[in-house]
A protein has these predicted regions:
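Beta-strand-loop-alpha "switch" segments that mediate conformational coupling across diverse proteins
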Residues: 73, 82, 100-128, 142
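NTP-binding/hydrolysis catalytic cores, primarily Walker-type P-loop NTPases
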Residues: 106, 120, 124-158
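Short, surface-exposed, charged/polar-biased interaction segments
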Residues: 30-37, 99-100, 116, 130-134, ...
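Conserved catalytic-core segment of NTP-binding enzymes
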Residues: 1-108
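Hydrophobic transmembrane alpha-helix bundles
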Residues: 2-20, 111-119, 144-156
Length: 158
């Protein structure tokens, strides 16, 4: 995975968590605070979901209890694309750890898809990869990944 892709994944996880709170909150003050927190230069200095939760605790139980419930409900799955080595696979586990440590959010690393020229060829030919090469290495990756998702299994650390 490219560094830019990793950064984008962290940004997506953060913003989708904030959107979840805004969407389900019935408290205008909470929605406004979350909206403001999405700006890195907000007046409260909130930069992460963990910092948002700490700030909400200072404001009282109504908003912080709701946000804590949303934190427990929010459980995104992570899939790595274009993996080239075992070190790339370790990035998935590192991202799980970093999300919990810095964001206070649990993320499940479900698997990966290896880098493979068959994908590009499939896109250029506008034919589904699984129709062209279901038994290829990438086809097996996709089948394994689908099984992990359906069975809600995480990738064990190597």
């Amino acid at each position: 995975p490219e560094p830019t892709s990793i950064e984008n994944a962290y940004r997506f996880i953060k913003s989708s968590f904030y959107r979840q709170i805004r969407l389900y909150s019935e408290t205008p003050e909470l929605r406004d605070l979350v909206e403001e927190s999405m700006d890195r230069n907000n007046r409260h200095g909130i930069r992460t979901p963990r910092e948002l939760l700490l700030h909400l605790k200072e404001l009282g139980p109504e908003m912080s209890d709701f946000a804590e419930q949303q934190t427990e409900r929010y459980r995104p799955s992570l899939i790595l694309n274009q993996v080239r080595s075992n070190n790339d696979i370790k990035v998935g586990h590192a991202m799980e750890t970093a999300c919990l440590k810095y964001f206070g959010l649990s993320v499940d690393f479900r698997g990966y898809v290896t880098n493979n020229d068959l994908v590009r060829r499939s896109v250029l030919q506008r034919k589904p990869l699984m129709m062209q090469s279901p038994d290829s290495e990438i086809g097996q990756d996709l089948q394994r990944l689908l099984g992990n998702i359906l069975q809600r299994q995480k990738v064990p650390p190597s």
